[in-house]
Amino acid sequence: MVKVALLASERVSLIRQKGIYRKDKYNTMSINEIQDEVIEEFQDFEDWLDKYQLLIDMGNDQEPLPESEKTDNNLIDGCQSRVWLVCDKDGDILRFRAESDALIVKGIVALLIRVLSGHTAKEILDADLYFIPRIGLTEHLSPTRSNGLTSMVKQIKMYAIAFSAQANNQ
């Protein structure tokens, strides 16, 4: 198992070197372009242990939230693990930050943020998150983690609804 994890980490390094997994380029990519890239990355791995390791590495690559933001208000309901989600608005653009106390869940929320952060509320609300079934994520999660994934997506979309309504009232 250690060898498998090492191989997955090496592949993540190769993915980053090829320029596929670069946070700074997502500002210019559409949600669908990012989803297609995620699908391509996950297709590089045949074994789900490697895919889990990729998720863990993605989660560990995220900046941790300050303790001051790990509040009940930022906690996502419906997740077995503790997941905090923060949304910042920059003009019309929504930027998400998150953290979890569970490694795989931290990776899942990092993946959602990668796809949805940096886009407008309308783009987020209109997004069909087809990458989730295409990479096989839901079928390889326990029912409780699958419910948590649904709750994370719901919370991100709720932020988009709230900011969209706020913009319409101004």
Region spans (language model):
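Short, Lys/Arg-enriched N-terminal segments with co-localized hydrophobic residues
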Residues: Q17-T28
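A short interface-forming secondary-structure element
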Residues: S100-D101
